[in-house]
Amino acid sequence: MYTCAKFVSTPSLIRRTSTLLSRSLSAVVVRRPETLTDESHSSLAVVPRPLTTSLTPSRSFQTSAISRDIDTAAKFIGAGAATVGVAGSGAGIGTVFGSLIIGYARNPSLKQQLFSYAILGFALSEAMGLFCLMVAFLILFAM
């Protein structure tokens, strides 16, 4: 057991590990491959490299014309899907006032109560339509 520990913990390995642990993670990932010397072939240890502090990114962030076209198409698709809610609002308003007419035809004595419920249904449906329209404009012009 002591022989294995002595073999595994050679001074060059300890030096290499301490150098590796003292670097930041991105410096370790971005580093270049190391070369082995004749001395390191004989002792199976890697020659330690000097600590580099400059971290150069491997690729810079670029947007191409294709990705801009995809973003524009996604905006239009999202705005179109949000505009469908405005059509749903129109259908809801038609349903509310159609139900008002049917209810008034069945029981004319409930005119005032039916009308107040119709106004409430109209307001809720219109609010949802305006919300969908606002989301469509936000998708088009704010993103």
From Swiss-Prot:
GO molecular function (one): proton transmembrane transporter activity
Keyword field contains Transmembrane helix: yes
InterPro entries cross-referenced by the UniProt entry: ATP_synth_F0_csu, ATP_synth_F0_csu_DDCD_BS, ATP_synth_F0_csu_sf, ATPase_proteolipid_c-like_dom, F/V-ATP_Csub_sf
Primary localization: mitochondrion
GO biological process: proton motive force-driven ATP synthesis
Source domain of life: Eukaryota
Keyword annotations of the record: CF(0), Hydrogen ion transport, Ion transport, Lipid-binding, Membrane, Methylation, Mitochondrion, Transit peptide, Transmembrane, Transmembrane helix, Transport
Bilayer topology term: Multi-pass membrane protein
Entry-linked PROSITE patterns: ATPASE_C
Annotated disorder: This protein is the major protein stored in the storage bodies of animals or humans affected with ceroid lipofuscinosis (Batten disease).
Similarity comment: family membership: Belongs to the ATPase C chain family.
Function of the molecule: Mitochondrial membrane ATP synthase (F(1)F(0) ATP synthase or Complex V) produces ATP from ADP in the presence of a proton gradient across the membrane which is generated by electron transport complexes of the respiratory chain. F-type ATPases consist of two structural domains, F(1) - containing the extramembraneous catalytic core and F(0) - containing the membrane proton channel, linked together by a central stalk and a peripheral stalk. During catalysis, ATP synthesis in the catalytic domain of F(1) is coupled via a rotary mechanism of the central stalk subunits to proton translocation.
Name this protein carries in UniProt: ATP synthase F(0) complex subunit C2, mitochondrial
Organism: Ovis aries (Sheep)
